[in-house]
Design a protein with these regions (language model features):
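Extracellular zinc-dependent metalloprotease catalytic-domain scaffold
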Residues: 2-252, 257-379
Length: 379
């Protein structure tokens, strides 16, 4: 479930999430494992065309749950708090793309600026996408989904979703102009689609109030590091010192996973090889999909153009769908990052203390490939 190669014990724990990595001098090395083959089976609580619903769980276990919570007044924390949970925050304009942040009671123990950093991360996405839907995300501090986070964890995410098939996924993405012509398309395999992405693709009710997922953020207590709580809505942060990690970057990363930025690359679910929509854009070479947890590259033109190298999770651990950054912050070669020594991609598999995690144009193209309509297309 979790791996850490950092001398200070810092790591990220999540179903699909952001990971801490090594410094410029390779003096620290934080890693976590993507338990992408873990699905927690759940009963579906609202009408949809996909049937039974599942929950991606960070523990790697598969078990049924008795229900799926509504997004209203949802507080799950088992951590003792002296205050009630803050009221939910709805980010975005009614009738457009919205994210409803349902604050867990644990957030009352977060430092000043924590909530605003998460809000600004959500606002970045609502400013970029024009899809008409509302995504409901529970936010915790030092916990996720009512459970303790691993010691030293930066962030975790868990996502509700559905098992469907290749034809359903590709038929919907084809409406956005994408074609699927690789020689090894997994046409007979099953696919996992997060609840949020299913809304985007028109497969479920876009205004459903049930939770789409959870994100949790570590306290960094006892690690010697702290959070940079500076935030803005541009997707390009600043001010992260050498002993800090960029909270807004982690929030951008974790929220994007709930939105569907995850990979499975054939992981077994119910004894069947399972993929995600993003796996259909992970290429080994022109015309050939990777279909493997080993490193491939992101491409939207059947592998002709490399828009960024994916993490080799088979060799390095970490998430399959994150950008390669085990060797350096810019290893993936993603496009459109602002210039600067201390700038890294927010979707990178391994983060670095002292680096601001920003959104690249490759990140935006990745989200567009999942069905999110950009208000301003990438040039």
């Amino acid at each position: 479930m979790i791996q850490s190669h950092d001398l200070f014990g810092l790591e990220l724990s999540h179903s699909f999430g952001f990971e801490l990595g090594q410094s410029d001098t390779h003096s620290t090395h934080d890693m976590t494992h993507n338990s992408g083959d873990s699905l927690l089976q759940a009963l579906h609580q609202s009408q949809n065309s996909l049937g039974q619903e599942y929950l991606m769980n960070d523990s790697g276990q598969v078990a049924p749950v008795v229900g799926h919570s509504s997004s209203s007044s949802h507080t799950t924390s088992t951590i003792t708090q002296t205050h009630a949970a803050p009221a939910p925050t709805v980010v975005g304009t009614a009738g457009g793309f919205q994210i409803k942040l349902i604050w867990d009671s644990s957030v009352t123990g977060a430092p000043k600026g924590f909530m605003q950093a998460v809000i600004d991360a959500a606002q970045y996405y609502t400013s970029q996408f024009s899809n008409k839907e509302i995504i409901n995300i529970n936010v915790g501090y030092g916990e996720i989904a009512g459970g303790q986070m691993s010691a030293g964890a930066l962030g975790e995410s868990e996502s509700y979703g559905y098992l469907t098939n290749y034809a359903t996924v590709t038929n919907e993405l084809a409406k956005d102009g994408f074609t699927f012509a690789a020689t090894n398309e997994p046409t007979q395999s099953q696919f996992f689609v997060t609840s949020a992405e299913a809304k985007t693709l028109g497969l479920v009710n876009a205004s459903a109030t049930a939770l789409d997922g959870y994100v949790g953020f570590g306290t960094l207590s006892g690690t010697g590091y702290s959070w940079n709580l500076t935030a803005n809505t541009t997707g390009q942060n600043s001010g992260t010192s050498p002993q800090q990690f960029d909270l807004q970057s982690v929030a951008l990363h974790e929220i994007s996973e709930v939105l569907g930025r995850i990979g499975m690359e054939g992981a077994s679910v119910n004894n069947n090889a399972t993929y995600t929509p993003l796996d259909l854009f992970n290429f080994k070479s022109p015309g050939t999909l990777a279909l493997s947890p080993s490193s491939g590259y992101f491409s939207t033109d059947n592998g002709a153009t490399n828009l960024g190298m994916f993490n080799d999770s088979a060799s390095n651990g970490g998430d399959i769908a994150d950008w390669a950054s085990y060797q350096s912050p810019t290893q993936a070669g993603t496009q459109g990052l602002p210039a600067g020594f201390n700038v890294a991609d927010a979707f990178a598999a391994f983060g670095y203390p002292g680096y601001n995690g920003d959104i690249s144009t490759s990140d935006l193209e990745e989200m567009a490939a999942l069905g999110y309509t950009l208000k301003v297309p990438v040039a």
